[in-house]
Amino acid sequence: NMIAVKNHLDELESEAIYIIREVASQFERPVMLFSGGKDSICMAHLARKAFWPGRLPFPLMHIDTQHNFPATIQYRDWFVKEELGANLIVRSVQDSIDSGRVTEETGPLASRNSLQTTTLLDAVKEFNFDCAMGGARRDEEKARAKERFFSFRDSFGQWDPKNQRPELWNIF
């Protein structure tokens, strides 16, 4: 039934907006991860709705693998500047490779995706962020299905689900 689907989506949207507002109020230096892809565009749209008509109270940050289509980067820059009026921080995996912080993979299945973690952790430290918001669909990967709204990480960016605190969002 379309009404039930719409009501469910409205509930999910309201919950997401509530959590984004909570992050902005409870953390001193939050950042929203933003690549220009569909997940991050959805997150940015929810953030815009959360603070409309004001501006976002936190910057957006892209950890760039430099393996994106040029049109994606152009759209990223346009969307952040023109649609959101937000501050965009870009840090490059290539810079991490050039500085010797990470080693680029080789071979036919080489990817820079796993190298993003070091660049992200370096940027979090550089800007002293105390919360990084990102969007991921739980149905894409089993590990993501275990994640909660807040996934507390250690200094290496690792998440241990056994140490995860309970989240009782709808018990109040």
Model segments located where?
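Nucleotide-activated chemistry modules centered on ATP-dependent adenylation/adenylyltransferase
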Residues: N1-F172
